[in-house]
Curated annotation (Swiss-Prot):
Protein name, UniProt field: cAMP-binding protein 2
One matching Pfam family: TerD
Subunit-level organization: Possibly a heterodimer of p31 and p34. p31/p34 could also associate with CABP1A/CABP1B to form an active complex.
Family named by the database record: Belongs to the CAPAB/TerDEXZ family.
Source species, domain of life: Eukaryota
UniProt feature, compositional bias: Polar residues: 16-35
Organism: Dictyostelium discoideum
Any GO CC annotation of this UniProt entry: spliceosomal snRNP complex
Residue numbers spanned by region Disordered: 1-94
Bias (Pro residues): 49-60
Molecular functions (GO terms): cAMP binding; pre-mRNA binding
Gene Ontology biological-process entries: mRNA splicing, via spliceosome; nuclear mRNA surveillance of spliceosomal pre-mRNA splicing; protein splicing; spliceosomal snRNP assembly
Amino acid sequence: MYNPPPPSGSQGNNNYYRQPSSTPGVSNPNPQANQFLPPPPSNTQAPRPGFPPSAPPPSAPAGQYSMPPPPQQQQQAGQYGMPPPPSGSGIGTGVSLVKDQQISLSKEDPYLRKLTVGLGWDVNTTPSAPFDLDAVVFMLGANGMVRQPADFIFYNNKQSRDGSIFHHGDNLTGAGDGDDEVVSVNLQAVSPDVTRLVFAVTIHQPELRRQNFGMVPRAFIRIANQETTRNICRYDLTNEGGTNTAMIVGEVYRDPQNPQNWSFIAVGKSFPGGLQFLCQIFGVNAS
């Protein structure tokens, strides 16, 4: 788990992210012991074999998770079935953020209800194998961990159980300008016991392909009002990844004093171990 960042508007030193002492890729049975502070659509792509299974069915035995499943607030079918906005769309440029900077989304746009979260990157043109980067979202409770496996949103689990988050699909190449992957968020539908939405990007099969984030220049995340297409903020990462294979790009989190309000922090923190490592520190069983 990890604690909330400083109040919106301040800049921290990113020390609330601390790596756990357990071995990357091994599920941590005791998250309390190791504190960790702080997309064009395709619905027909076959699931990738061997890595994390989709969320268990709603009929999973009671008590399987440390917290109860979220209230059943499933959205109408097709509410998020539309394609994501065109690449690079949005009115204006929004506030340009630097690493560790925070911004109150609710103050910047008092009528904000739904977000478009666009993530993009360019890749070097000379690697031996094509790049495949994946955007993922972790829905965290107050303890800094997912409440259940369904709170991990990725290419094989595109919609959250409460219907508030929809991943528009995996871009296998990262080609072209603008957004490479898009996530839609209905803030009003996020379960009340979810306090943080962590947006990360990982490299698929980095060891096999001999790739890392040092080969991925010009990555960014942008936040826009989905209903008006107005860009609220954007964070451009510059050589943040080094030899690492997973990166937390930013987080959308509730205001502790007013849970109806939301803020964003530009994180830009990279880690070794790829997607498995992120799953470990946020309590997702990736075995």
